[in-house]
Design a protein with these regions (language model features):
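Short alpha-helical elements
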Residues: 1-180
Length: 180
């Protein structure tokens, strides 16, 4: 299923006059609550959520280049490294990776550089308690909000992480097919 999804995204990029593969990705994670039936859940202390994390790497249109699902107790940095590790083919041509302040640290940047040739840009907010739109970061937040349109993804009801991954992939496939 992932190969078909990647083909649809590549076709969409070609129609826009871009290359099939992107050289710029934005990476972020979203914590999602789980139901009582779910066995694969962890506790995200930062957001105080017991559940899973969806790690996404999106291109400039907001469509995923890679998706990875982990328990919520996995840090954003470790989840992003796993995301890149399991999807190395998608990150071959990536030159720049934009992340938020949850991914700070020289070790993270070095690990990403050793896996790919991408340069990591950490975008931070200037004022802690003031809302401001950070340029290009809204693209990944929009992608997460698209997932909110699918009732099944509001809360994780799946027993296996791989099933959650497939549900997220199906939601993005439906979104792409609906638009084009």
């Amino acid at each position: 299923m992932n190969s078909g999804f990647k083909k649809i995204v590549a076709d969409r990029r070609l129609r826009q006059g871009r290359s099939a593969r992107t050289s710029f990705v934005i990476v972020d994670a979203q914590s999602v609550k789980t139901t009582d039936l779910t066995k694969n859940s962890g506790y995200d202390g930062g957001k105080k959520i017991s559940g899973i994390k969806r790690h996404l790497a999106v291109e400039i249109n907001g469509f995923p280049q890679a998706i990875h699902i982990t328990r919520a107790n996995i840090t954003d940095r470790d989840g992003a490294i796993a995301l890149v590790t399991f999807n190395l083919e998608q990150f071959k041509l990536v030159r720049t990776m934009m992340v938020d302040s949850g991914y700070t640290g020289q070790n993270f940047a070095n690990e990403i550089s050793s896996l790919t040739s991408a340069k990591v840009i950490v975008v931070k907010r200037n004022e802690l308690h003031q809302f401001s739109v950070i340029p290009q970061r809204w693209l990944i937040e929009r992608s997460f909000s698209w997932l909110g349109n699918y009732h099944r993804l509001w809360r994780n009801c799946e027993r296996k992480l791989n099933t959650s991954l497939m549900m997220v992939s199906l939601a993005f496939i439906r979104l792409l097919l609906k638009r084009y």
